[in-house]
Amino acid sequence: VSVAQDGGDSVSVAHNIDSRIVHNARMIAVGATDVLDTYLSPEKYTGIEMRYMSHTTKPTRFDRFSMVLSHQGELLKAHNRADNNDEIGGYYNFHYAWRYNWNAMGGKLHLEAGAGADVLLGFIYNLRNGNNPAQAKMSLSIVPSAAAVYNFNAWHKPFSLRYEVFVPLAG
């Protein structure tokens, strides 16, 4: 088992399974959020969110392809401008994709391109509405995706810089 730091926000763990390396990064994030759901309220709500993400990339039996699994959970609490009402919400996002892989620069640069499916389930609850206090959310999308990974060594340790893009095509 080897451990590599990706940036400063996550730790990536690689397991050697049948000489195939599985990369897994887990991240926790806390930050600001803006919520505008005009079904529940015409007001924009601002607040805080907490998010957990697990991202796994592993090779398949087919040499040039890899499989990507991403799980993401989010909880949020936000208030309106008058600060007399709150909304709470939660989301779960699952992404599954297959990508074709290219290596460049002697294996230091790794490029991936492919497509997958993205599923989102969630809710928003307005604490003060009496008639329709909640809204459920669900979506299914076909998602082309790409990634670029640059591997390097610093301070005698392996590091990876990874950039990914997902663009909903249909759904």
Which residues does each PLM region occupy?
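Short glycine/proline- and aromatic-enriched beta-strand/turn motifs that initiate or cap beta-hairpins
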Residues: 4-78
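Short loop/turn motifs that connect adjacent beta-strands in outer-membrane beta-barrel proteins
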Residues: 16-22, 57-67, 101-111, 153-161
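Transmembrane beta-strands of outer-membrane beta-barrel pores
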Residues: 30-36, 71-79, 117-125, 150-152, ...
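Extracellular loop and loop/strand-boundary signature of outer-membrane beta-barrel proteins
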Residues: 36-44, 78-87, 129-135
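Residues that define the transmembrane beta-barrel architecture of outer-membrane proteins
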Residues: 44-52, 86-94, 109, 134-144
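Residues on the lipid-exposed face of transmembrane beta-strands in outer-membrane beta-barrel proteins
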Residues: 50-60, 92-102, 115-119, 144-150, ...
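Surface-exposed loop and membrane-interface regions of Gram-negative outer-membrane beta-barrel proteins
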Residues: 74-101
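Outer-membrane beta-barrel transmembrane domain signature
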Residues: 131-171
